[in-house]
Structures are given as C-alpha cells and as structure tokens.
Amino acid sequence: MRTAQITRKTAETDISVEINLDGTGTYDNLTGVGFFDHMLDQLARHALMDMTVRCAGDLHIDDHHSVEDVGIALGQALTQAMGDKRGIRRYGECVLPMDDARVACALDLSGRPFLVWDVEMPTAKIGTFDTELVREFFQAFATHGGITLHLTQAAGVNSHHIAEAAFKATARALRDALEVDPRTADAIPSTKGSL
C-alpha cells in the first residue's frame, strides 16, 4: 500500500495528514476553513486518494498559514507515499468543465517542482475565503510534492466554479499519473533510472 502520515507543527499551525494513494476517495478533512475543506474533499474524491487532514491554525490572523501549510504537508505526504515512484504512469492531464468554468491541468511527478498558474478569479473572496490562497495552496503542494504542475483556465466567470475546476482537474490528472502501469510495474518511469 502506498500510504503516508505526516505531522507538521509550527508556531502558526499544527497539522496532521494521512493519505492512501490506492484508496477509493474517502475523506475526512477539517482545517477550520470551510471552503478549503470542500476543495480538499474534491481533491481526495476525484484522485481516488483516501485523505484525512486535521489543521489547527492561527485563523484569528487569516486563513493563509493554514492553507499554505496544509499544501506543504500534503505535498510531503504525497512524496513519502510515492516512494521511488516505481511503476507509476508519471504524467497526467485533464480538462475539466464546471458550469461556466473550464480549467486544464497537466502534471509530471518528476521530482522537479514548478507551478505554471494561468488562472484568474474575478472576485477577491469566495464567501470569507481569499481567492489568492488557491494559488498559494498549489504552489506549496507542487513544491513539496515534487510536481511540475500547469493549471490553465480557458473559461469562467464564477470564482467558486473556477477554483473547484482547478482542484478537480488536478485530482483527475493525479489519479492518472499515480496509477501503476502493469507493463512497467517494476520500472522507474525515466531513462535516468530515478525520479
């Protein structure tokens, strides 16, 4: 089983993350940030990754530290659960429509973190959630997960739909990239011999 448990404690947040890459998409995410929990639920469900996240953060300041630090911990958990990445397909992509929004995700589990973010949300807030934190999450997740991650928005006028399409597209691309290819189950998916 490709699983991981991460705990991360700083002066700003106290986080625990458990994931199972070979799960069915069950989730139990409580960060104190309702909209963010909803996005994490989408990530787990559509990646078919079992996920439990707990975060106690300095929400009296704002949501920034909690969202970014969960991205860090989740990326670390992904790296740990993948191990040497033997047998994975490595690459994934998805173009995902959600009502007015359409977001494309292309990713490579390369070990070379990089984020290309071509997504614009028309509002500064979704409820009480700062929309700029969506990018902060993906930056932290890509950096600590060793993911080359491209997210490109082609359409959308509703910030909630755009954000959700980005999370779901990433989830679907991750699902494909993490899948073990039975033809190369014992091989590292690189001519270098390591990722």
Curated annotation (Swiss-Prot):
Its main location: cytoplasm. Signal peptide: none annotated. It holds the Pfam family IGPD. One of its GO terms (molecular function) is imidazoleglycerol-phosphate dehydratase activity. The keyword Amino-acid biosynthesis applies. NCBIfam families: PRK00951.1-5, PRK00951.2-1, PRK00951.2-4. It is found in: Cytoplasm. Keywords: Amino-acid biosynthesis, Cytoplasm, Histidine biosynthesis, Lyase. Pathway: Amino-acid biosynthesis; L-histidine biosynthesis; L-histidine from 5-phospho-alpha-D-ribose 1-diphosphate: step 6/9. Belongs to the imidazoleglycerol-phosphate dehydratase family. It catalyses: D-erythro-1-(imidazol-4-yl)glycerol 3-phosphate = 3-(imidazol-4-yl)-2-oxopropyl phosphate + H2O. InterPro entries: IGPD_sf, ImidazoleglycerolP_deHydtase, ImidazoleglycerP_deHydtase_CS, Ribosomal_Su5_D2-typ_SF. The gene is hisB. It comes from Jannaschia sp. (strain CCS1). The keyword Amino-acid biosynthesis applies. One of its GO terms (biological process) is L-histidine biosynthetic process. One of its GO terms (cellular component) is cytoplasm. This is Imidazoleglycerol-phosphate dehydratase. Its EC number is 4.2.1.19.
